[in-house]
Regions:
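N-terminal leader/linker segments that precede catalytic domains of diphosphate-processing enzymes
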Residues: 1-59, 63-109, 113-114, 136, ...
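Acidic, glycine-rich loop-and-strand cores that form catalytic or ligand-binding grooves
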Residues: 120-157
């Protein structure tokens, strides 16, 4: 039986996160800022064409968070594994807003400086090449916006008799914004564009 003290013991010092996170996949990414020609650039990867998931797409360094690993540790580890940067060249400034994707990914983005890019040695199994975009260009060129419909398709084994309206119950649909940035022959879209947009919002007047 729970009394007042037991309730306090369970709830005190609880750190809120995301309800249902235990059923979601977790990942972390690093937004690398590079100083080049007196201007800040953002470094992007073009994923290898041989990858099973999202081949040839543009992304930030990053990947899944392993057991016992913090999101920050995962972002740094994945950056080292993918582009070969030295740990001391990765200077994290801040964590940005969490991104929850429609397919139940929790993504922890971090932003910081990547120094000494001459140390980069790409893991060609994962990364075809990298390129950089001036921060000023991204701030001056707004993305194109589109909206996908996210629809609930209920399991036919649901106990509809327990739901008001039963099989006539109207499940809500939602909208998921899809952003597209173009730079030269590159198209930055999807998850990467959403994370980028959140980062760029910090520099709006």
């Amino acid at each position: 039986m729970f009394n007042r003290q037991k309730v306090l013991d369970r709830l005190t010092n609880h750190k809120p996160y995301i309800n249902g996170s235990e059923y979601m996949r977790r990942a972390a990414v690093f937004i690398p800022m590079v100083r080049k020609d007196g201007e800040i650039h953002i470094l992007f990867e073009v994923r290898a064409s041989s990858l099973k998931h999202r081949p040839s797409e543009i992304s930030f360094p990053g990947g899944g968070i392993e057991e016992g690993e913090t999101p920050l540790q995962a972002a740094i580890r994945e950056t080292q594994e993918e582009i070969g940067s030295y740990p001391e060249d990765i200077k994290i400034i801040s964590e940005l807003d969490l991104l929850i994707t429609p397919v139940k990914y929790i993504i922890h983005p971090f932003v910081g400086y990547l120094d000494n890019i001459e140390h980069i040695k790409l893991n060609k199994d994962e990364v075809d090449h990298v390129f950089m975009v001036p921060l000023s260009y991204l701030l001056e060129n707004q993305p194109k916006r589109y909206f996908n419909t996210v629809q609930v398709l209920p399991d036919q084994n649901l106990p509809f008799d327990l739901i008001p309206g039963e099989k006539n119950y109207k499940f809500e649909n939602g909208k998921s914004q899809v952003l597209f940035y173009k730079y030269k022959d590159y198209v930055i879209w999807g998850i990467t564009a959403k994370i980028l947009y959140n980062f760029l919002e910090f520099f709006e007047d």
